[in-house]
Amino acid sequence: MNADVLTTKVTDGIAVITLGSAKRMYFDAEMGDALTESLQEFAGDPNIRVVIVTGGTPGYFNRHFSIPALIEFAEAVRASGRQWPDNAAYHGGFFDKAMALCETMPKPVIAAISGTALAGAFEFTLACDIRIAEDGDYLIGLPETELGLLPGASGTQRLPRTIGPAAALMHILMGRPLNPRDAEKKGLVHETVSGKAIDRAMEIGKRFCSHTPESLGYIKRLVRSAIDTPLAEGLALERNLFMRLCVSDQALARMRSYEEKKITDPSRSLEA
């Protein structure tokens, strides 16, 4: 795999995907394919418990989708005469498979936002389960209206599901990205850290690795589906998955250990 596109590394069950280099700070079709391939590999590997995606250049997670590539695509479409009525069939975009993998694999996916993440780059992070940003002089968000566009890689759909429709509408219409601290205040990211985002992501990843993979997968499945599932159905699935875990060897062993005082504080904070 071209190291300018992305690199991967696995440490103690945590897979880290590092996007691009100083030569390649933009999303494009090649990076989309490489990212999808890596995510598919890690999703199917039982030895991988957590996946982290981060940037490969100081000050950048990934700038945004390649504008030259988008112009070339738009000109080709114009020449074809193709039209897009509201009811046109949806065929997916460059990063749809990668984002779907982030959401559906039964493992936590963490975006360690190490710098600028605009437009398509930020939209990709919205498909990740956790977003950690490092503090700095850079921007996060959706500026597409400045180019006469709209967020076309899921931003109009995933951001409302993340921060609510009203806040999402304001952010997208304004087209003004936020600094990391303001992004945290608005709910675009979960945390902003003064150190390296990758260090905090690894800390969280190690905490997740201390849990059983079954519980992590079930929790992700339940919470991810909650917004689109009728409450009665969600509660029924929650109870079924709870019982499946409750009778498992791992859960019984941990509960017995807790009763025997071998585990003194099962609810210790991530901040500990």
Describe these PLM feature segments.
Residues 1-54:
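Conserved CoA-thioester-binding segment of acyl-CoA-metabolizing enzymes
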Residues 3, 255-272:
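Terminal low-complexity tails and localization/encapsulation signals of metabolic enzymes
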Residues 17, 35, 53, 66, ...:
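Terminal peptide-recognition signature
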Residues 30-34, 94, 101, 200, ...:
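Charged catalytic carboxylate motif
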Residues 55-97:
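Glycine- (often His-adjacent) and acidic-residue-rich active-site loop
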Residues 100-213:
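Crotonase-fold acyl-CoA enzyme core
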Residues 133-138, 186-236, 244, 249, ...:
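C-terminal long alpha-helix characteristic of the crotonase
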Residues 171-172, 219-223, 242, 258:
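Short alpha-helical scaffolding segments that buttress acidic/His motifs in well-ordered protein cores
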